[in-house]
């Protein structure tokens, strides 16, 4: 409670430590009572796609009293699963393995990534 109060006027996000609680609905109820703004969760699995069923339950239980932000292993192959959950926010690095340690190979690559993120943002806002 004290951390949440100290964080004001900033929003407070409770991170994936939540994924270790034994009774997730009870834990979510506590976060709502504490007035946390957001919960980052993988649905108590290694990746959010594996925990999507619990994430759906958390979204339904929250009834917009707290933002549920799926995170862990979300990428271009599974992001639509989460966009279709009607969440406001998704956490992800959207990284890919590279053959070399170099940064990006060209400005075009940066612009393509930026366009992808802009398109995803537009879909999330719909």
Region spans (language model):
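Glycine-rich phosphate-binding active-site loops on the catalytic face of alpha/beta enzymes
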Residues: 36-49, 85-107
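Histidine/lysine/aspartate-rich catalytic loop segments that bind and position anionic ligands
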Residues: 9-49
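Alpha-helix-loop-beta-strand connector modules within alpha/beta enzyme cores
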Residues: 1-16, 50-75, 106-126
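Catalytic cores of alpha/beta
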Residues: 1-3, 19-34, 56-64, 68, ...
């Amino acid at each position: 409670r004290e951390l949440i109060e100290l964080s004001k006027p900033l929003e407070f996000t409770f991170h994936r430590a939540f994924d270790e609680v034994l009774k997730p609905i009870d834990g979510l109820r506590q976060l709502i009572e504490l007035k946390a703004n957001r919960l980052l969760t993988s649905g108590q699995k290694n990746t959010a796609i594996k925990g999507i069923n619990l994430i759906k339950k958390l979204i339904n239980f929250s009834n917009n009293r707290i933002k549920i932000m799926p995170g862990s292993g979300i990428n271009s192959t599974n992001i639509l699963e989460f966009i279709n959950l009607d969440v406001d926010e998704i956490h992800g690095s959207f990284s890919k393995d590279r053959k070399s340690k170099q940064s990006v190979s060209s400005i075009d690559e940066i612009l393509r990534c930026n366009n992808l993120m802009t398109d995803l943002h537009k879909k999330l806002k719909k």
